[in-house]
Structure formats: structure tokens, C-alpha cells
Amino acid sequence: MASTSNRNFFSSNMTQIPMDEKIRIALQFNNLSQSTKQTLTKVYCALAIGILTATVGVLFSMFIYRPGFLMTLLLVIGSAILFATTPRTQDYKTQVKRFTLFNLVTFVTGMSSSGLIELYMDINSSIVLNAFMATCGIFISFTLFSLLTNKRLYIFIGSSLASLSIGIFVLALTRLFGGYSEPLDQLFILAILASSVLFIIFDTQIMVHRIENLGEKDVLFHAFILFYDFVDLFRVILKILAKKENKNNNKSRR
């Protein structure tokens, strides 16, 4: 039934349907079971809460209290380990504990990013908001692509990520020992951006596979993985926009 609905969506008959109706049909996600859609709704609600908590962590670190680098690092690692090692049982007490730990992880991750955000705000205060909006747009776009397609691309993407990671490592070594080169630096940043996008597709499709085929409906764990995909993409876009702003400022001074 689901595959038939999906085939109908891409059939030539769909050309006669208005665009808004096509979008409505697509967003019904008929290729996914009802149980999977319910789980995904909870996952993305948890992710939204995590992003909001991280934002609070950034503001807390900027305006109230900023711990040292070592303490922040220990807090991030410690909270992540606590979250990952807490039993994934479904009883109420454990779920409350894991939800608290999940928000602690996102909060301290936000704290750890505050210094970087302040640095880029000094260049141009609009960079951070633009980077966040761009991150949301890219993340949502590739998430929808991953959910709407019937083809499970995670095996192909996994091998591509492995090759890309090796390429990024080689580029990093070249930058470290070969001196600064503008084209090489741009290639390095674009490679990291590509890997961030591929991780969104890979992790989303792996999540759907585990929910549908393995019955792994651990909402908080899936949200935890996607949260770091979002944060990594945000940091990369932030760096790209800041680099572009610096370049424009240098041109205007000449």
C-alpha cells in the first residue's frame, strides 16, 4: 500500500495536480508506517527541545557564568557518557532521568559553543542568525529528502563518508605542513560541509531503518544523534559565513 502510494506520487498523473496539493501529499509520508511516523514526530520534538536548551546554554555562558575550557570539556564528555550509559528502559523514572541528561548534554554543548559564537558576533552580529537560519533550511531539506525517498542510501553514503573522511584527513595534514593556501582552505571547508550534509542523510536513514526493521524506538537516543548533526552543520556554516564576511571587509578596506 505504501509503495503504491509512493509510485502514484511520482507518476505522470501528478502533473495535473496543483503544487500545493503535491506538497500536502508528499508530507503525508505514505512510504512510512503509522508507528514510524509517530516515533519520528517524538524524535523531532525532542530535537527541537534540545536545540532550544542549547540556545539557553549559549546565553547562560555569555551573560551569566562561563566555566573554563577544561571544565566545559569535562561537562560535555561526562554528560554524554552518562546519557549513553543510562539503561534504555521504558519505565517512567528512567525516562525522566534520560530526558534530564539529554537536556544537560544539549545545555553544556551550547555553553561550549558560546565562545565561538561571540567571536563571530564581533565580526558581524547578523552572522549567527544567518548561520542558524541556513542550518535549519539545509537540515530540514535533507531530512525531508531522507524521509521521502524509498531508496535506503545509507550503505552507499556510509562508504562515501569513509572515503570523504580520509580525504579530509589528508587535506588537514596538507594544510598543517604545507602552509596556507586559499584554494586548499576552501576545498577543506567544502569537504567538511559535504560530510556534515551526508551525515544528516546517513543518520536519518539509519534511524528510520532501526525504527521500522529493528523496532528501536528510543526517541532520546535518535534525537541525541541528530542534535550533534545539527550542531556540526551550524558550526561549519558559521565558519563559512564568517570567512566570507572577513573577505568582504578586507576588500572594502582596499
Swiss-Prot record:
The keyword Membrane applies. It is found in: Endoplasmic reticulum membrane. Keywords: Endoplasmic reticulum, Membrane, Transmembrane, Transmembrane helix. InterPro entries: Bax_inhibitor_1-related (IPR006214). The keyword Disulfide bond does not apply. GO terms for molecular function: calcium channel activity. The chain crosses the membrane at residues 44-64, 67-87, 99-119, 127-147, 153-173, 188-208. Its main location: endoplasmic reticulum. Residues 1-43, 88-98, 148-152, 209-217, 239-254 are cytoplasmic. It is a multi-pass membrane protein. GO terms for cellular component: endoplasmic reticulum membrane; membrane. Residues 65-66, 120-126, 174-187 are lumenal. Residues 218-238 dip into the membrane without crossing it. It comes from the Eukaryota. Belongs to the BI1 family. This is Bax inhibitor 1 homolog. It comes from Dictyostelium discoideum.
